[in-house]
């Protein structure tokens, strides 16, 4: 879906170069994949815009990785190479960084267990507290995250320490803001703004993406920080408050509508099973998506009232897109397919809504490239072709295909009568 908000300008509007900001929401590995595919489509199909020359980048959680890369001069295609492709280069962002067990956190919590057990027994036996109340004290022995996120800081620091890049907010050409949430107050922490810009970009990224339950909170200057999406979905006001002419927002997570498209062709479409058939993970995913998207919708209504002189364009997936909703982002094959899917879907959205988008973008010197939009053979990624004379490669390819087909069957099969 592409949503636009119209700016109301006076005749004295500035004729200087338009101020452009880019706000990227979170969404885990899936969010990063979608945003990369969508950005590549925008870069290919919009003339007059350079996504490495924005005035302000705002990133939350996974969107922070993309925002930081763009601010450091990495093009959308280079980000695709780093996040999506599975080539043995030092530029790759390996998803294995995200699934290392948090042994240090677990060990620290286990050390507390004897004392907590003693405290619980004392409260129950000596103080006469109810057993359930006494056992609540054992909650402090549970780890705050199951995966270690320290590797995120180390690897991003390495990538941004290369020549021509910087891990220091203050040395970037454009403004970069990475938003986390302070755990003890619930306040937003806009790393990169004055007073917050001394923190390394890699550490701010680690904090902004520290989703509670998955990753432990990140300690910065003696305070604990967690995922920035806990406070807001986009934090677009960070850029809007500083004044921009055009704000482009990318939101990768939308609630899924398990119903066919309306229209004459709807009767011939295959029945989409209820999400309840996917069990707890699917129900929780839909719940989480619905909550963050409702916040986003309320936020955009507020933006329209409070920032009438700014054009705002929101780009997000179709809510009936089952491929994105049921994706396995830790599968290399599916990462490539999802990035290509996001690329093609974004191009289709631009074609469908060009009458609505064109005049708004033209006010800022941006034009739709009709040739690129109509090019049916244009792709983000070239198909991977394994050598026919490599038995191991062929076997691995067949295994990937079988597993992907099995997963697709399990997530989309209809309920039994």
Task: Specify the residue positions occupied by each region the protein language model found.
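Catalytic cores of secreted/periplasmic lytic hydrolases that degrade extracellular macromolecules
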Residues: 63
